[in-house]
């Protein structure tokens, strides 16, 4: 029995030893595979970093290293294939190891006691064997790390200045993508190696060296900008390829022809990568980057083309100005007497041209501004590329639109015509030589008309008018004394009139201005504005004849154009010019296109649908006139109506001072000594009267001496009120002479509208009527006159006042009419109801 047990124990120990040996072999193979995996991507990454750094040196080096890249990529492919094979073998070993483990578990369950001792012994043996194997592994790992370090090239600190950013960016992108693929594998490998090396006595140093090597390789391939300090330190200690920061710092001095060479090299790299099987570098991002670069360059090229076209147009405009100035100088040689004036006018026109060109450019590039009518000239555009450019299309569209608008404005009917007539005796002919020169230059002017039409297109009409006014001002300042106009223009002389018409048709604006300058040099003009209107008239007439729709001999002008020219005209200085026997007279009729006065058309704002209450309605109770359908008027009417009813309503009290009784009512008097309810009623009525009359809410001079008379109708309503007070002085109204007026209505209107005055000499007066009011519906019934009669008899006890002793305070137009009618004269007395001593 013992022999059987010993045999079983030996068998089990042999089985365990074999399983341990196999497990150790699989672990060794896994570690070697992981190292192979690490070395493979490291070599590829370092070769890529090396190629990216060396590709920035020169073009020949790039071409030589293209082959190295392809060879290295092929070696990488082989390494990946071997790794795949190793993984397959590892899977087979792992399956066998799992089966053996299951068999070991079964044996352990069968004899647990024997297995415990064997396990203890096997663990010790395993530790001894593992120590020796780990030392061998660590030596192998160290050797591989040193080989990797030696394979790295030394850092090249000096690089050429013609490196470029585009190749750097593409290489960095590919490296980053590879690093992302490698990171997953490298992390697992690092964990395995660290777990194996930790237990060994020399493991810490090797671990640190291995980690630093991996970190250096990964950071060099990524070219990270976030940690420049770490990369510089590693450059000092270890030979690491140059980082992307150093490369970017040396990208400033880039040359244009080398860009094209680098592009070609990049395209070749893409082609080689696509041909290789299982290449890790994708070619799609490089193509997209190149497309983006090409699009950006095309945009820049279009912008540069626009700038060149604008610059060429400006230069061509300046050339035209110089040509036209030279043509003007040739004309000046024929007329030596006009050289000084011509030079000044040409210089000013050139300045205006520059200003107008600047305005045109501002209007083109800033559409928010109001566009002016400007004609575009296409100068020196010969190539098909320029003709098809956006800038020329914009100019052509604007030119066509402006021309269309001007044709429409010419076709439109003209509202008014101005006649320019020259008085026959006003102009005398003393210099026939100037007339011959004027007629002789006609043929020469015909030849120059085509050239001067360009100047018309550049300059606007407003600039032309301003130029003419400046020229006129200069000529009037330099005009000699005791001289007359050179030419005699008479409407009765038909041949000369025809010559003038022909000259208007053939000559351009500047030729006509030159002729008038030659006239104005020898003529004093008293009215500068008249001459300027003549020039502007002739100028705009010739401008109208440019278009086919206008008549050939039309010398009329719209009045609004002359008003525009007079507004834009500079204010001339006041020069004292001598009076001459003959002067220029221009008769201009009034403008036919005057703005008519805005008629106050009574618009019907409310629909008349046959309702009873429509339009203005007057209330029978309060007498207010309001619009029935207007809510605002209705609310105002309600307020006034309620106030009027409450104020006018008279209940009556016990002690009434009845002064007189009439069939339509009675008159009562209220004194300050009366009860409070009576005084309260008087105050309420006085407030209503003040609002109706528009009086100031001012206290009376002496409330204790006032007397109030009320006219109460039979229906117990207060329809009249009179407030009187004691005064000392009054002032006589000054009566004005009335014009001859036939009807009484006109007389009443005149009395109401005219202003009235009073004298400053005071006259004695006793009774002053502060307020007198009668309800509007009860007027023309002698209510006011009856109240004054009662006042005259009851104001002072035992005496009857005369009309000369009564004064009125600041009467309204109706009150003034009543006072004149009651007193029988317009020279009645007035006083200030606030202060009885002073006049109004």
UniProtKB/Swiss-Prot annotation:
The main location is nucleus
Q: What is the effect of changing residue 780 to A?
A: Nearly abolishes autoacetylation
Coiled-coil positions are: none
Variant or mutagenesis effect after changing residue 789 to A: Reduced autoacetylation
Q: Which InterPro entries match?
A: AcTrfase_ESCO_Znf_dom (IPR028005), ESCO_Acetyltransf_dom (IPR028009)
Q: Compositionally biased, Polar residues: which spans?
A: 46-58, 65-74, 81-96, 141-153, 267-278, 551-565
Q: In which tissues is it expressed?
A: Widely expressed. Expressed in heart, brain, liver, placenta, lung, kidney and pancreas. Highly expressed in muscle.
Instruction: Report the outcome of residue 786 to C.
Output: Decreased thermal stability. Strongly decreased enzyme activity
- Major enzyme class: transferase
Keywords recorded for this protein, A-Z: Acyltransferase, Cell cycle, Chromosome, Isopeptide bond, Metal-binding, Nucleus, Phosphoprotein, Transferase, Ubl conjugation, Zinc, Zinc-finger
Q: How is it modified after translation?
A: Phosphorylated during mitosis, when associated with chromosomes.
Compartments annotated for it: namely:
Nucleus; Chromosome
Any one Gene Ontology cellular component term annotated for this protein: chromatin
Q: Which residues carry this modification: Phosphoserine?
A: 200, 412
Q: Where is the composition biased (Basic and acidic residues)?
A: 1-25, 131-140, 178-188, 319-338
* Outcome when changing residue 640 to A: Strongly decreased enzyme activity
Mutation effect (residue 622 to G) = No effect on association with chromosomes
Q: How does it assemble?
A: The subunit structure is controversial. Monomer. Homodimer.
Which family does this protein fall into? Belongs to the acetyltransferase family. ECO subfamily.
**Main role?**
Acetyltransferase required for the establishment of sister chromatid cohesion. Couples the processes of cohesion and DNA replication to ensure that only sister chromatids become paired together. In contrast to the structural cohesins, the deposition and establishment factors are required only during S phase. Acts by mediating the acetylation of cohesin component SMC3.
What protein name does the entry list? N-acetyltransferase ESCO1
């Amino acid at each position: 029995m013992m022999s059987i047990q010993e045999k079983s124990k030996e068998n089990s120990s042999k089985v365990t030893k074999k399983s341990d040996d196999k497990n150790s072999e699989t672990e060794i193979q896994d570690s070697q595979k992981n190292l192979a995996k690490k070395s493979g991507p490291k070599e590829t990454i370092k070769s890529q970093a090396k190629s990216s750094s060396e590709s920035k040196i020169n073009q020949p080096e790039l071409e030589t290293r293209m082959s190295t890249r392809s060879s290295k990529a092929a070696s990488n492919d082989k390494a990946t294939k071997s790794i795949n094979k190793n993984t397959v073998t590892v899977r087979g070993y792992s399956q066998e190891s799992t089966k053996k483990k299951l068999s070991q578990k079964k044996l352990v369950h069968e004899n647990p006691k024997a297995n415990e001792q064997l396990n203890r012994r096997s663990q010790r043996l395993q530790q001894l064997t593992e120590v020796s194997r780990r030392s061998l592994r660590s030596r192998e790992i160290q050797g591989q790390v040193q080989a990797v370090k030696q394979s790295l090239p030394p850092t090249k600190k000096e690089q050429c200045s013609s490196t470029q950013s585009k190749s750097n960016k593409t290489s960095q992108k590919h490296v980053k993508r590879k690093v992302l693929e490698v990171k997953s594998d490298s992390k697992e490998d690092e964990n395995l190696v660290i777990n194996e090396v930790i237990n060994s006595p020399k493991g810490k140093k090797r671990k640190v060296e291995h980690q630093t090597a991996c970190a250096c390789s990964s950071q060099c391939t990524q070219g990270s900008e976030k940690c420049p300090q770490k990369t510089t330190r590693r450059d000092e200690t270890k030979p690491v390829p140059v980082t992307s920061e150093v490369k970017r710092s040396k990208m400033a001095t880039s040359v244009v022809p080398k860009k094209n060479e680098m592009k070609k090299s990049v395209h070749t790299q893409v082609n080689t990568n696509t041909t290789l099987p299982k290449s890790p570098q994708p070619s799609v991002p490089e193509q997209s980057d190149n497309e983006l670069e090409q699009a950006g360059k095309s945009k820049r090229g279009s912008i540069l083309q626009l700038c060149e076209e604008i610059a060429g147009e400006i230069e061509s405009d300046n050339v035209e100005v110089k040509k036209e100035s030279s043509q003007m100088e040739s004309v000046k040689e024929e007329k030596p007497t006009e050289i000084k004036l011509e030079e000044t006018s040409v210089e000013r026109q050139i300045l205006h041209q520059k200003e107008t060109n600047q305005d045109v450019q501002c209007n083109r590039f800033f559409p928010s501004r109001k566009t002016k009518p400007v004609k575009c000239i296409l100068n020196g555009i010969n190539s098909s590329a320029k003709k098809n450019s956006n800038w020329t299309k914009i100019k052509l569209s604007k030119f066509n639109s402006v021309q269309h608008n001007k044709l429409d404005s010419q076709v439109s009917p003209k509202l008014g015509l101005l006649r320019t007539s020259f008085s026959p005796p006003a102009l005398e002919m003393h210099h026939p030589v100037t007339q011959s020169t004027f007629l002789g230059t006609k043929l020469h002017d015909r030849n120059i008309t085509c050239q001067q039409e360009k100047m018309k297109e550049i300059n606007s009409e407003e600039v032309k008018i301003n130029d003419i006014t400046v020229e006129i001002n200069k000529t009037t300042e330099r005009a000699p004394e005791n001289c007359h106009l050179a030419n005699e223009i008479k409407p009765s002389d038909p041949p000369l009139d025809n010559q003038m018409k022909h000259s208007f048709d053939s000559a351009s604006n500047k030729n006509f201005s030159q002729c008038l300058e030659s006239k104005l040099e020898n003529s004093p003009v008293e009215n500068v504005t008249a001459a300027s209107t003549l020039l502007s008239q002739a100028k705009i007439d010739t401008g109208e004849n440019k278009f086919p729709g206008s008549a050939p001999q039309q010398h009329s002008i719209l009045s609004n154009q002359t008003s525009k020219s007079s507004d834009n005209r500079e204010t001339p200085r006041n020069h004292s010019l001598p009076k001459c026997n003959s002067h220029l007279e221009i008769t201009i009729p009034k403008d036919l296109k005057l703005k008519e006065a805005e008629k106050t058309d009574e618009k019907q704002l409310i629909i008349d649908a046959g309702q009873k209450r429509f339009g203005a309605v007057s209330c029978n109770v309060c007498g207010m006139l309001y619009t029935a359908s207007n809510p605002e008027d209705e609310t105002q009417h309600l307020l006034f109506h309620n106030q009027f009813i409450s104020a006018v309503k008279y209940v009556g009290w016990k002690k009434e001072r009845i002064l007189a009784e009439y069939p339509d009512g009675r008159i009562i008097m209220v004194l300050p000594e009366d009860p409070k309810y009576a005084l309260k009623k008087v105050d309420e009525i006085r407030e209503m009267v003040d609002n109706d009359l528009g009086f100031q809410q001012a206290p009376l001079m002496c409330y204790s001496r006032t007397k109030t008379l009320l006219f109460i109708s039979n229906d117990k309503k207060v329809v009249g009120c009179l407030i009187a007070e004691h005064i000392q002085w009054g002032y006589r109204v000054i009566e004005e002479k009335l014009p001859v007026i036939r009807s009484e209505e006109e007389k009443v209107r005149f009395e109401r509208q005219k202003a009235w005055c009073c004298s400053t000499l005071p006259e004695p007066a006793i009774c002053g009527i502060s307020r007198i009011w009668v309800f509007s519906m009860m007027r023309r019934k002698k209510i006011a006159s009856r109240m004054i009669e009662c006042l005259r008899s009851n104001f002072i006890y035992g005496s009857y006042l005369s009309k000369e002793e009564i004064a009125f305070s600041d009467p309204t137009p109706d009150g003034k009419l009543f006072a004149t009618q009651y007193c029988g004269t317009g020279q009645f007395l007035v006083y200030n109801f606030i202060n009885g001593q002073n006049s109004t």
